[in-house]
Amino acid sequence: MSRFFTTGSDSESESSLSGEELVTKPVGGNYGKQPLLLSEDEEDTKRVVRSAKDKRFEELTNLIRTIRNAMKIRDVTKCLEEFELLGKAYGKAKSIVDKEGVPRFYIRILADLEDYLNELWEDKEGKKKMNKNNAKALSTLRQKIRKYNRDFESHITSYKQNPEQSADEDAEKNEEDSEGSSDEDEDEDGVSAATFLKKKSEAPSGESRKFLKKMDDEDEDSEDSEDDEDWDTGSTSSDSDSEEEEGKQTALASRFLKKAPTTDEDKKAAEKKREDKAKKKHDRKSKRLDEEEEEDNEGGEWERVRGGVPLVKEKPKMFAKGTEITHAVVIKKLNEILQARGKKGTDRAAQIELLQLLVQIAAENNLGEGVIVKIKFNIIASLYDYNPNLATYMKPEMWGKCLDCINELMDILFANPNIFVGENILEESENLHNADQPLRVRGCILTLVERMDEEFTKIMQNTDPHSQEYVEHLKDEAQVCAIIERVQRYLEEKGTTEEVCRIYLLRILHTYYKFDYKAHQRQLTPPEGSSKSEQDQAENEGEDSAVLMERLCKYIYAKDRTDRIRTCAILCHIYHHALHSRWYQARDLMLMSHLQDNIQHADPPVQILYNRTMVQLGICAFRQGLTKDAHNALLDIQSSGRAKELLGQGLLLRSLQERNQEQEKVERRRQVPFHLHINLELLECVYLVSAMLLEIPYMAAHESDARRRMISKQFHHQLRVGERQPLLGPPESMREHVVAASKAMKMGDWKTCHSFIINEKMNGKVWDLFPEADKVRTMLVRKIQEESLRTYLFTYSSVYDSISMETLSDMFELDLPTVHSIISKMIINEELMASLDQPTQTVVMHRTEPTAQQNLALQLAEKLGSLVENNERVFDHKQGTYGGYFRDQKDGYRKNEGYMRRGGYRQQQSQTAY
Amino acid sequence: MASRKEGTGSTATSSSSTAGAAGKGKGKGGSGDSAVKQVQIDGLMEMMRSLRHVNIDHLHVGWYQSTYYGSFVTRALLDSQFSYQHAIEESVVLIYDPIKTAQGSLSLKAYRLTPKLMEVCKEKDFSPEALKKANITFEYMFEEVPIVIKNSHLINVLMWELEKKSAVADKHELLSLASSNHLGKNLQLLMDRVDEMSQDIVKYNTYMRNTSKQQQQKHQYQQRRQQENMQRQSRGEPPLPEEDLSKLFKPPQPPARMDSLLIAGQINTYCQNIKEFTAQNLGKLFMAQALQEYNN
């Protein structure tokens, strides 16, 4: 189980090879009987583990011995001391205990000690005789052990009920148990500890021998798990006992009832295991020739296995009697199946089938939801595991299964609020599966859903976006969203804030890019909404995506502690705002978050999201008619010429040589699925048009300015490309349209410009893609008119002495106040040297601007000035070398301070040189 | 000249009937190192062949080039003309300005390299020192050869004929007052050259600075060396061996000065152009003014 989660979560980096290694290590010992399989180092690691365990257990047994001695001489003080030491030692041995289960001898000493203390407590006579120290120690020890034993209650009760329960299963326990039955006998006790130790040290061989005896081909691993299960059964039964609290009789009765099936069932389990193992072997067959012989030995059994599959199906009938026991079997089986995970030969498809069968069995037997949930978790995990390669994606049928499975799982979880699911539930002890009153199952629904989302993205990435298939896959998106929504609801009830944040983010990621047409419609027709039919009303009832985003994001802003989730949430929120033309909210959020400052430190997917957001913001600004903002937002993305790459919408061919295969894979995984793409042509068009609206008037205003800078390099590039064309036909592409429009605008010909920007072709290519196309077009026409007017004035103001505003308003089809305001603005900004003559409604030019020739002459003069200065320096140099001859005369026309200083310096130098 | 062709890179051959510089024999186009030159030579050969074909007595006396606002003083022209003049001493280059001609006055000029420049070019040493020694400045790079155009009588008759037939409007191109464009262009070009000149000077300046710095270093090094040697002498040790100073201090590469000479020449041409142009235009403006006053 835990193995899955590690592979599941860090799957990004883990290669299949290392994954395998990870799996083989703990399992290595399982093949103790198959020496061919067992490599040297595996044995070594095993030994290391054993010795650590031995050491701890030795410590424990030593302490137990002293306690028993103290008990014998009624030295309670000593008992107390030793008990405390024992508690500490047990704490140290915790890790081993977690692995191996609570050692029986430890339980026994706890039980015995408690009994003994109770005995002493009861014994009034003895107590009176006791010295003061002892009496005090007695009471404290009694309290302590009561408290302490509460943790081990289940173990102790089971031990008390049936001290010899597993006697015939395990030699160690056998030893211990027999010891337990004669617990008064102190001498034997000491010996038993020793034997225990001895047993431990020779454990592998002894065990295997034992099991050889017991059943021919039982694996050690199955034995181990069996072991665990047995402990488990004990605990489950005792738990149910303690729940009932009726009395021991019933429990004992049930115990006895169970007893029979136990052995019976054991055989069953063995058979099942055999079958399973044979199956595994069968898979492995091709791989290892050595194994062939062994295989041959078991050939007969292998045959039986094939028949054994129905046996699995039949099994339920046998289990019908005792539910608890079936839990154990099912879980044991589950563990078995899981052990095979990640191994090379394992048939993953078969594994999934097996697990599904198991679920069926569990369901048919009403094994309780806990088991089903657990198995479901594993099925989903195996489904994810099905593809060993990260690059490949799930097959459609697998994907469907996965979705169904998750849905079923959610059904169960919703139906049974008493099931607790969590990643961390079972970390201490693997064997506590489903026993407590509130069912506790290890597994994280959130991780599963996140993984599901990843798989979905992968599927979308790997499907041709222009095929019908893609559309089919896209239909699953609704399902994915539904699942996420359900998980969200579930986690809102049960999850921690972090989990809620994560699921919220997932929800946000599935919401932010979708345009909310319903809300949009509602906005457009607010009054009619009320008069609409009932059905429409219901349709409209669904939460506005804006409200939803607001709610989810706010929660994340408030609760999230990881920076990444918050960053993503903010970006998505901005994107969503921008998509719905809420420019000011989007902009404010962007500015407040200060993301622009530190986004370069984020990881690439977040950067891609940031780029997408910026682009969306720019497009939003454009729709609002804020050309400058639009241009600024899009500048970074567009100026690099790598918009495609920056938005994660495709790889550039150019850089193909620069990256190796590995990098390419990584980059490929970063790609945004097609349905999230932002139309690049639209993007470029928006950028170019806004650049045109800014640049053309600017160019006209600074026609003759030497230090003119360009606002948009890319726009200029396009213009130059257009100029270079030997033959100019009517524009075809979007860029050509914009270039042609720019040329028309340069002449102040807004009508031509308009016809180039807005026509059939451009509508189809760009403008119709906006949700409010007509509004955008109207805005655009107006912008073109205004900017054309400005350009016209810049370009031709030198021709006019005065110009009537009415004429201008006729020319540009703008109303008089607008013309007035534009011209006033230009005058105020000192862009236009003119004044308005109010009574006649004319603009009177001042003619203070120099003409083109004058400008040129001025520039020439400036250049000549610098030329002269440079020339002087040459001369100065000469003069320096020839020794300060002209120094005094030259100062006259030296105005530059720095220059003079340098000259002086040189003179000094030359003087020292001579 | 009886016939002329437009376009850069074509060759002019003067038929024997043409006056002007008479040559002794045919010249080769020189070593053509650029593609343009190759075309030039091909064109030349073609022309020669054609002339021989129609059995015309001809001499190869140079080549011609059309120009744009008088920007012809370039390295390419210098190289070409040098190779021509090297092969055929009497070669000239004809510069034809179609724009100016379109404005009403035929602009056709013949140039030759001065003997001084020929010397320099032969040496192929354009370092500042060499140029200084040759005592060459931009004024003395090219010498203009006066042009006399002589047509056959038949052509003269034709010309007269045509002049009578031509419309009046064609003649008044000469009096056009719309001159700003031409002037602007000239200014623009002049400005570009000034920029280039400026850069060139900066380059030269850096070179000078580097040289002087190095001189100083060299000097210091020598002094230090001397001091050390003195000390060594006083201690009775043998003096340090002499090292090759030129190896230690590699003098910086002096920039070629020919380009700046050419630019200066070009600037000069522009200035003359502008001067000429403005003089003409001023005259025209005064005339226009007088005309207006008279009309009023």
From Swiss-Prot, chain A:
Phosphorylated. Phosphorylation is enhanced upon serum stimulation. Residues 166-190, 217-232, 291-300 have a biased composition (Acidic residues). Coiled coil: none annotated. Residues 674-850 form the PCI domain. The modification Phosphothreonine is found at T525. Pfam families: eIF-3c_N (PF05470), PCI (PF01399). The modification Phosphoserine is found at S9, S11, S13, S15, S16, S18, S39, S166, S178, S181, S182, S910. GO terms for cellular component: eukaryotic 43S preinitiation complex; eukaryotic 48S preinitiation complex; eukaryotic translation initiation factor 3 complex. Keywords: Acetylation, Cytoplasm, Initiation factor, Phosphoprotein, Protein biosynthesis. Component of the eukaryotic translation initiation factor 3 (eIF-3) complex, which is required for several steps in the initiation of protein synthesis. The eIF-3 complex associates with the 40S ribosome and facilitates the recruitment of eIF-1, eIF-1A, eIF-2:GTP:methionyl-tRNAi and eIF-5 to form the 43S pre-initiation complex (43S PIC). The eIF-3 complex stimulates mRNA recruitment to the 43S PIC and scanning of the mRNA for AUG recognition. This is Eukaryotic translation initiation factor 3 subunit C-like protein. It comes from Homo sapiens (Human).
